Amino acid sequence: MNKTLIAAAVAGIVLLASNAQAQTVPEGYQLQQVLMMSRHNLRAPLANNGSVLEQSTPNKWPEWDVPGGQLTTKGGVLEVYMGHYMREWLAEQGMVKSGECPPPYTVYAYANSLQRTVATAQFFITGAFPGCDIPVHHQEKMGTMDPTFNPVITDDSAAFSEQAVAAMEKELSKLQLTDSYQLLEKIVNYKDSPACKEKQQCSLVDGKNTFSAKYQQEPGVSGPLKVGNSLVDAFTLQYYEGFPMDQVAWGEIKSDQQWKVLSKLKNGYQDSLFTSPEVARNVAKPLVSYIDKALVTDRTSAPKITVLVGHDSNIASLLTALDFKPYQLHDQNERTPIGGKIVFQRWHDSKANRDLMKIEYVYQSAEQLRNADALTLQAPAQRVTLELSGCPIDADGFCPMDKFDSVLNEAVK
């Protein structure tokens, strides 16, 4: 990682921090506990020899400054900015004191044991609590999935496997992807790709998707949906990383509308694999159990601030497992953006002597990511209020804590 660049980022946001605007909160409401479930920040795509990317186009892929799958230097900068912004917000709500390190054990950071997730958590802590001794907890063996964040099938019955595959096929059947495949074939020159010339796989539109739900493995798919996801993911990461536009998809994406059409493949891949209720409830169970413990069963002794860092599959399956209502993120084509956080907030209403839950998706817009915009309360991250089907919200986005508890209690059964 480029430490000079990171240090400059930390210094830069301190200069922008003055005159921060207050966020409107109902009178008498006090924030008491926060849990953030974050996706890792910007990583390099996997474009090694023989990969889906290399097989899908005759074109040469641009070089990245880190190995495939690892957090980039810019990803670190972006996460420092997000950490700084969240610190400002927490200070505004009285959860931390400006210019001071939080007392021991009040902040707990826990990441999946891959480089991109652990590094994301480290950079978030650097931005939020610079100079403070707050460790990032993770499994000792790096490069392996932590069971809490590992979205694998945990039912070994043949009946469940069949049910899960049928559920994934049903999710895919809801999608209209022909236009997306046709545009993608044109962008990558698929007819001249190694996949076409060597394997006679020359059409994404006509290709067949085959789903799998094997015990102790992630839900999977082979076929055009996987190819499409890999390609659009790579283009999206190029855009965020700040590659010149003539290098992003070789200059072939000319409009926002084309980005929207292509993003249907990436979102559709995630929706098909991880958002059917049957699959989501199974693969998200360890994460749901962890969140239930922190926010419900052990909340009186839990850290005031918990930061969890995992993957888009964790967030997608969690949102379905808890039965969130459909949501729309503005200024973003990704359903679960890079570096985005589901922020669970437990509030106390002193006037009515009751506890409330508010849940927001806090994320950086596509332009904030590409431009590496520093974030403050004056130049904030994007925030979208989410709603659980089992916990209806009021006009300010709050729902009763007892109803939230019931949702979690049901989800961990």
From Swiss-Prot:
Endpoints of the signal sequence: 1-22
GO biological process: glucose catabolic process
This protein's record includes keyword DNA damage: no
Disulfide bonds: none
The keyword Hydrolase is annotated on this UniProt entry: yes
Enzyme class: hydrolase
InterPro entries: Acid_Pase_AS, His_Pase_clade-2, His_PPase_superfam, Histidine_acid_phosphatase
Residues that bind substrate: 39, 43, 116, 218, 311-313
Entries under Gene3D superfamilies matching the protein: Phosphoglycerate mutase-like (3.40.50.1240)
Main localization of the protein described in the UniProt heading: periplasm
Keywords: Hydrolase, Periplasm, Signal
Activity control, per UniProt: Independent from inorganic phosphate availability, and apparently submitted to catabolite repression, it is positively controlled by cAMP and the cAMP receptor protein.
EC code(s) of this entry: 3.1.3.10
Known function: Absolutely required for the growth of E.coli in a high-phosphate medium containing G-1-P as the sole carbon source.
NCBIfam families per UniProt: PRK10173.1 (NF007553)
Name under which the protein is recorded: Glucose-1-phosphatase
